[in-house]
């Protein structure tokens, strides 16, 4: 067990009637806030989930006027893009999103789950769900729409090391090239919602990415407003505008190109039903690597050592025209560290 001695700091603030003011407590003003060699928060399977506690209060006239306390974790999230060329002279290039937490490359395994809406979930049930997912060696959960989970939801994810990426807008309500492409119509209200979500949730270490929308895209005005808002409120996490796109970007959303490649996809059928093995071999040929697939369905990818044990050709050169494809080094690209990251940022 680790223990940090309590740190107490005080800052005088003048606030007029009806006035709003942002008050910052920084290590430049308070050196004791600079913690050396802190106990870190890690994803499930990569280390401990150390959490620390903070109490904030605003005192006026010798009495507490407002107060808030919460747990937080200390961790660093970096991202990269794994670039791979596949297929002979006219090689196609695929990019897979890579996450590093506290310098460790994380093999993301998980799926989608939505917090129940308008249902009264007990705290015990929420914690039990998180615990069962952690025991299944899951470490990343994503939302498909714009959920507003309870604090208990995120506290359970913080406790069990479940990473989460948070989606701002509703899936398939703003499809480029259709009558819904300008939804939502009230962009100011949409941005207020984004700001509220970020301010409410951003202290949770389990959140590793902010995502604009799942599988579709907002129009250019809302796209830029959202991007600017995220940048102004959080510089510690990557922002991904969409998890996947299936339309003509040049014709319909050329503004998306400044954020490509996103490194995520769910191109093609999500494979929720049973199919003969030949179907999956053909699917890999059609859409190539899909190194970071945000929606997959039933199949799952084993760990690196397991792949090497039951696929003897797993270290052969990747080639879509080979009779053993995809039972070659493509199998290992999902799980093995690569020096070919074309992007790595904090």
Where are these regions (language model features)?
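Secreted/periplasmic carbohydrate-active enzymes, especially glycoside hydrolases
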Residues: 1-144, 148, 159-160
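Compositionally biased regions
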Residues: 15, 278-279, 339
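Substrate-binding/catalytic cleft of secreted carbohydrate-active enzymes
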Residues: 140-332
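Conserved small/polar residues in nucleotide/adenosyl-binding loops
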Residues: 334-341
């Amino acid at each position: 067990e680790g223990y940090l001695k309590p740190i107490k700091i005080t800052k005088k603030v003048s606030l007029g009637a009806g006035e709003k003011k942002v008050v910052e407590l920084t290590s430049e003003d308070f050196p004791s806030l600079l913690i050396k060699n802190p106990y870190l928060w890690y994803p499930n399977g990569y280390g401990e989930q150390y959490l620390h506690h903070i109490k904030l209060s605003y005192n006026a006239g010798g009495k507490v006027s407002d107060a808030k306390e919460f747990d937080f974790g200390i961790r660093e999230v970096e991202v990269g893009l794994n670039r791979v060329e596949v297929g002979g002279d006219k090689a196609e290039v695929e990019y897979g999103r890579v996450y590093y937490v506290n310098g460790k490359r994380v093999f993301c395994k998980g799926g989608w789950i939505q917090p129940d809406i308008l249902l009264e979930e007990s705290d015990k049930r929420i914690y039990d769900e998180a615990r069962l997912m952690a025991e299944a060696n899951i470490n990343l959960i994503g939302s498909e729409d714009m959920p507003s989970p309870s604090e208990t939801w995120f506290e359970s994810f913080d406790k069990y090391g479940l990473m989460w990426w948070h989606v701002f807008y509703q899936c398939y309500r703003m499809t480029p090239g259709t009558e819904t492409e300008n939804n939502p119509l009230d962009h100011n209200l949409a941005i207020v919602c984004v700001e509220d979500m970020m301010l409410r949730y951003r202290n949770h270490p389990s959140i590793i990415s902010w995502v604009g929308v799942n599988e579709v895209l907002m129009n250019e005005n809302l796209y830029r407003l959202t991007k600017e808002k995220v940048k102004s409120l959080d510089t510690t996490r990557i922002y991904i505008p969409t998890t996947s796109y299936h339309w003509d970007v040049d014709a319909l959303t050329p503004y998306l190109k400044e954020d490509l490649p996103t490194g995520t996809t769910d191109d093609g059928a999500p494979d929720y039903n049973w199919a003969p093995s030949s179907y999956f071999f053909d699917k890999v040929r059609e859409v190539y690597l899909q190194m970071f697939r945000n929606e997959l369905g039933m199949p799952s990818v084993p760990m690196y050592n397991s792949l090497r044990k039951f696929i003897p050709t797993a270290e052969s050169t990747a080639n879509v025209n080979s009779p053993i494809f995809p039972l070659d080094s493509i199998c290992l690209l999902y799980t093995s560290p690569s020096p070919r990251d074309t992007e790595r940022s904090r």
